[in-house]
Amino acid sequence: MGRSQEHGEHPSRVGEGDEEKIQPEIQKHISRSDKHDSEKGLGDEQGPGNGQYAQIDPAVASRIAENVDDFMTLVNEADDANERERDMKLSHAFKVYPKAIGWSMLLSSCIIMEGFGTSIVGSYISFPPFRDKFGTQAPNGDYQIPASWQNGIAGATNVGEIIGLQIAGVLSERWGYRWTIISALVAVTGFIFFPFFANSLTIFLVGELFQGMAWGIFQTMTVAYAAEVCPVPLRHYLTSYVNLCWIIGQFISAGVLVGLEGRQDEWGYKIPFSLQWVWPIPIAIGTYLAPESPWWCVRHDYKERAEKSLKRLARSSGFSQRDADAAMALMVYTDEMEKQISEGTKYWDCFRGTDLRRTEIVCFIWLAQTMSGTAIGGLSSYFYQQAGISDADSFKLNWGQNGLNAVGTIASWFILNKAGRKTLVLWGMIVMFILLLITGFMGIHDPPSTAEAWTAGTMVILLSATSNFSIGPVVYTIVSEIPSTRLRAKSIILARNAYNAINIAFINIVSYRQINPAEWNWGPKAAFFWAGTNIIFTAWIFFRLPETKGRTYAELDILFENKVPARKFASTQVETLLRGTESAQKEQVDLITSNDARKES
């Protein structure tokens, strides 16, 4: 059933004798487009041929017209919604969409729980009560968790996340984002029992494998939901807020460990795990009450449900029925367009046609986050200790580091809208490269002096803060914006799995051995290795990462379909509907008119 029929309207079907009825409507829309061109300072010389102007393929527009009722009404309403969203002021977005902000932040709080849990596991290798319980004595007399077990536990978490991500792809397709998250919250409540009651590293490892499965579901669903419930002006705030949720969880974890650092009995490490039971029930209740993503509803042809979700996400005083109709039209139009230009909605389709380029971008940008040097920051407490800083001071530094990370993410919100995604990421990578070099030079003397150890520790704090000002939060925005809406969840899953796979290979195996005194014992010199990987991915970002700031999803579809080079994404003028040069307009008119006429013949 077409959307006009859903609203009780009679679709205007075009028969063979009615071409003159649709021609004026198309020409009227083209006139609107020409007027918009003149306002933007565009002329016919800026057509798609010279790379400054991208538009929908006329054949694609024609096929969309075949699949929907009352095509011209759909086009006009979608055009209104596209311009409204693209030109919306931030203050207006905050005024109209406070509910969308609230629901998105609520579901993203799953990541606070995950950040707390993963940080606890990462910090336990340097936490005295845990080391004394499960560790073996190192040559220097201290108890250490063997590198093989460090790798195994961290690797089990990543493997669990990979499994969970795949489960998320299947469940979200059938149940939607909300029920997939709720099922993971129920599961993780039971999985916490494993590490809490563990009396050996084997049971602890199994527990982290199972917890990782639930965490993998959260990683995808929260980002996808945030990207689909808010308009363009709010998109980077709510998607990058996911990174802040990680930091909040890590900050709470660091504070708990500082408070328990002097406790030597088994409750010194059991209390942090027991605190994980605080999160699931209230988050599950809130998730149950939240509206489903309207984009998910449109993709599954639940259009009435999608409209209800739209209205629940916006304040009624600023979101009229006309606004809802226009927003629905844009979602339906975008979905129909993606059906025509994409191969399908299976995982394999992420590697076909223009979606291959999009998959490359989301995977590599998440790999860049890992390979930028943040591995050292992620093992900060352990790194500080091996650099010569006391246990107590190392945990305090880690706590302060997480506080600065939060400040960095919040500060990025004020820059991101002006600087753009690519600029902020690129300069962040360059600054991190310099900080890594300084850190490495502090480890040339073995052992480093007190001043060198503290300098290296300071550089790691600045490194982590820089990451969380740039690539840390921005990567969540990029991976949610780049994929097509029909493949968003699967693309994020593939990207996060690439991230987890590289973590297993480099972070869980290489980084632990680099720092562990019983293994390679590089100390601060490990930063030289990460400086090398940083510069490789900095080059990729410069040449391959496009700028997506201020683009609607329909506009991004057109840019990728037109194969616009990454360096021209920001400057290319895009029209998602009927627009372009005079010849292109005529071609669109002819195709759509003939197809509409053919429907009734």
Where are these regions (language model features)?
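Transmembrane-helix signature of 12-pass secondary carriers
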Residues: 2-311, 338-601
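Cytosol/matrix-facing amphipathic helices and coiled-coil assembly/linker segments
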Residues: 324-337
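Short intracellular "coupling" helices and adjacent cytoplasmic loop segments at the cytosolic face
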Residues: 313-326
